Curated annotation (Swiss-Prot):
This is Large ribosomal subunit protein uL13. One of its GO terms (cellular component) is cytosolic large ribosomal subunit. The keyword Magnesium does not apply. PANTHER family: LARGE RIBOSOMAL SUBUNIT PROTEIN UL13M, RIBOSOMAL PROTEIN L13. This protein is one of the early assembly proteins of the 50S ribosomal subunit, although it is not seen to bind rRNA by itself. It is important during the early stages of 50S assembly. It comes from Clostridium beijerinckii (strain ATCC 51743 / NCIMB 8052). The keyword ATP-binding does not apply. SUPFAM superfamilies: Ribosomal protein L13. Part of the 50S ribosomal subunit. Gene3D superfamilies: Ribosomal protein L13 (3.90.1180.10). GO terms for biological process: negative regulation of translation; translation. Keywords: Ribonucleoprotein, Ribosomal protein.
Length: 144
């Protein structure tokens, strides 16, 4: 018996809505990354983008457990000497909760062209409203 290898033309993509209100950032991000990658499908193929589209709503209401809100830092470097910028997650979640969520998911996806292609299927919204009603997304209940 041969192994099944999915082709890009054979893949059927669904749309899912995930409500992140009151849920831990990392747990939601790991499940979203798994769906974007396509690991929830029996036809998963590692070298093909076979994942589904995901809409995340209420990103501003996501929580971090413990003292991570003040102790965990978002770091970026300008590549100049002394160019390290560190921002606590409390500030990041107040100003740009969409960015914090996208970064968490991006770091869980593969690096390279395939990971960037998967990340394009992620739509994160601050509030409960989204403009993808025409795609008829299904509500996805998270395992946690």
């Amino acid at each position: 018996m041969k192994s099944y290898i999915a082709k890009a033309s054979e893949i059927e993509r669904k749309w899912y809505v995930v409500d992140a209100a009151g849920k831990p950032l990392g747990r939601v991000a790991s499940q979203v990354a798994s769906i974007l990658r396509g690991k929830n499908k029996p036809t998963f193929t590692p070298n093909v983008d076979c994942g589904d589209f995901v809409i995340v709503i209420n990103a501003e209401k996501v929580v971090l457990t413990g003292k991570k809100l003040d102790q965990k830092l978002m770091r970026k470097h300008s590549l100049y000497p002394g160019g390290l910028k560190e921002t606590p997650y409390r500030v990041v979640l107040d100003k740009k909760p969409e960015f914090a969520f996208e970064e968490a998911v991006r770091r869980m996806l593969p690096n390279g062209v395939l990971g960037r292609q998967m990340l394009k299927k992620l739509n994160v919204y601050r509030g409960a409203e989204h403009n993808h009603a025409a795609q008829k997304p299904e509500v996805l209940e998270l395992r946690y």
